[in-house]
Structure formats: structure tokens, C-alpha cells
């Protein structure tokens, strides 16, 4: 009997909690949108220039490409070197899976798309889990670092929320502990086993120097995600965008990681609420609400376009030696 079956209440919490959170947030956004004047909202959206829409979407794609790069680094550390474009393709196409309940579908799509290149499903899944853990941990630590620097230097207030430092510290602890290499590998194997795959043993030969280099790339990715929001704000309220660059480097990771921890599909609702609340003192109710919702729209459309282009534009060509790969790999 599995640990999960011994504790059915844990499974119920995992199912019920995201639903309750989404219902509460849906009520909040319904009330906020009801109070928003349609003409004002339409005028604000129409006033956003094309460069802000396109630039924000492009920066988002560059930002999440850092996670794809880190995933490839992990695969290389396990002795596999699939084609670069195939790795990027698998990563972006799999993003649609994060909107399904649970955390596993996106990772399974990744693993399935790389299987034709001789990468065992279990290995792709395990390294994908480690990548997600590190992306969240680096984001939390990056946000906490930026917040600490701003507060210690007496710069402009990061947020009106007095609980922000405690939220950042809690998220950092929650995400950094399982990201520790030995524990993340163990967690990845346990997750693979729960999904019905044989985790087996894989040789993980990635040193701390490579991991830290990958973490630096992930931090650059979080900067790009922050600039994606800033560019959107620049299109809505140009005078207010520049002063928000550094504070937003704490808000965006907090909102994204918070959405992940809350376990709503794709972080939907949670991320928008946290960004809206962070922007509220700086932009006002209407612009803060629109910025949060439009950012979700831009990021989702950018993901969909990138996945469609990569899916239709680059078909994987399977080398002959991979087609006749080791039977042990095929069984895995």
C-alpha cells in the first residue's frame, strides 16, 4: 500500500484546496471587473502600443527558455545529448499540459517527445521535476535577495504588504529545501514511481559549478519575466514603468512561485491576484487589474504561438541508431 493511499486526506486536500482557491479568486476578479468601466478598460487596452504587446510576449519566451536550457543541462549531466531544437520543442509544446489538474501532464509530454531521441521516459521525467524545483527555488531566492537589497538600501518601497518578507522567506524555504540535489533526485524518483514508471537508477554527473551556472541562467530568466511585465506597464503608463523595475523583480517571482505552490492549473488566479495587489498602490485599481489580466493573456498567447511554430515547423528526424537503440532504454 502506498503512502498516499494510507493518507487519503492528503489526496483530498490536493484536490479540494486548489478548487476552493480558484472559487475565491474568481469571486474577487468578478467583483473587480464588475466595478471596472467597460469604456475605460477598452480605451486603456486600445492605447497599449504594438511594441508593448510583442515585446512583453518575446521577453516571456526568452525568460522561460532559461528553464529549457537548465533542463538540457540536466540531461547532459545524465549522459544524454538530444538535439537542441528537439529539447526546446519538447519544452514549449509541453507547456499546454500545465493547465491540466496536477503537475504531471506537462512533464509526461516532455518525456514522450524526447523518447525518440533515445532519452528514457523516466530520465526525462526525473530531470524535468528537478528543473521545475530549481526554477521555483531560484525564483524565490532571487525575489528575497532583491527585496532585502531594496529594504537595506532604503530604496522605494517594494510593496505596501507588511507580510511580504515573510511570504518571500516562506516560499524560499518551501522551494529551496526540495531543490537540494540529493533530495530533488530522490523526490524525482518517487514522483516517477507514483506515475507508474520504474525510476531505476540514473548516473547524475552534474557538479556544483554546472548547477550554479544553470542557476545563474535561471536568474536571468526571472529578470526577463519581470521585464515582460515592465514593458506592458510601459505601454499602459510610461511614466510609472521605470521606477517599478527593481520592486517588480520581487513581485513576479513571488506571484509565479506562489501560483505553483497553490497548485491551481498553470497558477491561474493566484498569480494574477498577487501581481494585482503588488501593482495596486502604484497604478491604481483599474490599471493594476488590467495589467495582471493582460499579462496572463500575453504569456498564454506567446506560449501557444511558440508551441505551434515549433510543433509544425520542426519535425523530429529520428537517427537510425536511435531507432535501433538499446532495448533496455526502450523498456525504460
Where are these regions (language model features)?
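Transmembrane helix boundary and interhelical junction motifs in multipass membrane proteins
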Residues: 66-69, 100-111, 259-275
Amino acid at each position: 500500500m502506498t503512502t498516499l493511499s494510507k493518507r487519503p486526506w492528503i489526496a483530498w486536500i490536493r484536490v479540494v484546496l486548489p478548487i476552493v482557491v480558484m472559487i475565491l479568486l474568481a469571486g474577487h476578479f468578478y467583483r473587480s471587473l464588475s466595478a471596472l468601466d467597460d469604456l475605460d478598460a477598452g480605451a486603456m487596452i486600445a492605447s497599449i502600443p504594438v511594441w508593448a504587446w510583442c515585446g512583453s510576449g518575446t521577453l516571456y519566451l526568452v525568460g522561460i527558455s532559461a528553464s529549457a536550457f537548465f533542463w538540457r543541462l540536466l540531461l547532459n549531466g545524465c549522459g544524454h545529448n538530444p538535439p537542441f531544437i528537439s529539447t526546446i520543442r519538447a519544452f514549449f509544446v509541453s507547456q499546454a499540459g500545465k493547465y491540466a489538474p496536477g503537475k504531471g501532464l506537462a512533464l509526461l509530454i516532455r518525456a514522450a517527445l524526447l523518447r525518440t531521441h533515445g532519452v528514457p521516459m523516466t530520465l526525462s521525467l526525473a530531470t524535468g521535476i528537478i528543473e521545475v524545483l530549481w526554477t521555483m527555488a531560484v525564483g524565490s531566492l532571487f525575489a528575497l535577495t532583491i527585496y532585502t537589497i531594496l529594504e537595506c538600501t532604503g530604496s522605494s518601497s517594494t510593496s505596501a504588504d507588511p507580510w511580504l518578507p515573510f511570504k518571500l522567506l516562506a516560499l524560499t524555504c518551501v522551494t529551496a529545501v526540495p531543490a537540494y540535489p540529493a533530495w530533488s533526485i530522490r523526490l524525482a524518483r518517487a514522483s516517477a514511481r507514483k506515475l507508474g514508471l520504474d525510476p531505476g537508477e540514473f548516473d547524475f554527473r552534474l557538479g556544483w559549478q554546472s548547477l550554479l551556472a544553470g542557476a545563474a541562467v535561471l536568474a536571468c530568466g526571472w529578470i526577463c519575466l519581470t521585464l515582460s511585465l515592465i514593458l506592458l506597464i510601459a505601454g499602459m503608463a510610461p511614466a510609472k514603468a521605470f521606477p517599478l523595475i527593481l520592486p517588480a523583480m520581487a513581485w513576479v517571482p513571488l506571484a509565479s512561485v506562489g501560483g505553483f505552490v497553490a497548485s491551481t492549473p498553470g497558477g491561474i488566479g493566484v498569480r494574477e491576484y498577487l501581481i494585482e495587489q503588488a501593482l495596486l498602490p502604484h497604478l491604481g485599481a483599474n490599471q493594476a487589474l488590467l495589467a495582471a489580466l493582460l499579462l496572463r493573456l500575453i504569456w498564454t498567447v506567446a506560449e501557444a504561438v511558440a508551441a505551434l511554430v515549433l510543433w509544425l515547423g520542426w519535425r523530429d528526424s529520428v537517427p537510425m541508431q536511435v531507432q535501433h537503440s538499446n532495448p533496455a532504454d526502450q523498456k525504460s
